[in-house]
Structures are given as structure tokens and as C-alpha cells.
């Protein structure tokens, strides 16, 4: 089971998550609905530092990772980056092409992930 820690999590909850988690901790970068933000929360670095004070597990940031810019910013301070909603959006944008041009859809999604990967190069995440 992967545990989620949010910016609204109390210190007590973070301690409990750290004690029970295995593999990594999923750090929610924003409050609100997933995929609805354009920027990484300004307090994300402090939030990750607070969680790190309770665990040595890798911290993966998700929610709000919509662009190469946000992926790069998250990768600079986290051990992993999780992309969900924006992947679904890319697939949905290309749904009319799935039947007749499935390779084009795959290429569009791969190009999007390549742009995320490029943005994360030479960051803390890529160096570990």
C-alpha cells in the first residue's frame, strides 16, 4: 500500500505514514483536485523537508504535475515525480484518432513524456 501525505497532514499523521509506508511516500503537492493547478505549491520544499524529518524513504511528488515546467520543479526537490491527470488528458485529446491512427496517439503520448523527462534532466531526481 502506498501512503499519501498532503500539505494539510499533521505532524502526527506524517509520523504514522512514515512508520507504516514501504517503498516510497506519495506527496500530494497541492490541496484540491488533482490536475487542476498550473504551478507547484510554493510551500512544497518545506513540506517535503517536514516529511523527510520522519523518514528515509524516497518521496514522490504528484498532483498538479501538468507540464514540463512543473515536472522539472518537482524533480529538483523530490526523489520521484508522479504524472496522472495530464497523461489522461493527452489520451483523451487524441481519442478520435485511436481507431484509425493508434500509432499517432502513442507518439503524441510518448512525445509528452519525453518533454517531461527532458525537463527533469540534471535535477536532484535525475542525479539519484
Model-predicted regions and their roles:
Residues 1-5, 25-27, 59-63, 81-83:
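Hydrophobic faces of well-ordered beta-strands that scaffold small-molecule active sites
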Amino acid at each position: 500500500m502506498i501512503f499519501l501525505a498532503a500539505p494539510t497532514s499533521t505532524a502526527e499523521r506524517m509520523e504514522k505514514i512514515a512508520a507504516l509506508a514501504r517503498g516510497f511516500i506519495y506527496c500530494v503537492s497541492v490541496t484540491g483536485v488533482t490536475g487542476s493547478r498550473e504551478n507547484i505549491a510554493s510551500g512544497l520544499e518545506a513540506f517535503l523537508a517536514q516529511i523527510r524529518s520522519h523518514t528515509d524513504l524516497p518521496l514522490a511528488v504528484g498532483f498538479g504535475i501538468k507540464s514540463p515546467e512543473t515536472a522539472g520543479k518537482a524533480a529538483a526537490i523530490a526523489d520521484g515525480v508522479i504524472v496522472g491527470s495530464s497523461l489522461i488528458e493527452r489520451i483523451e485529446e487524441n481519442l478520435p484518432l485511436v481507431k484509425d491512427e493508434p500509432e499517432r496517439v502513442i507518439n503524441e503520448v510518448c512525445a509528452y513524456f519525453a518533454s517531461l523527462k527532458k525537463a527533469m534532466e540534471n535535477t536532484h531526481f535525475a542525479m539519484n
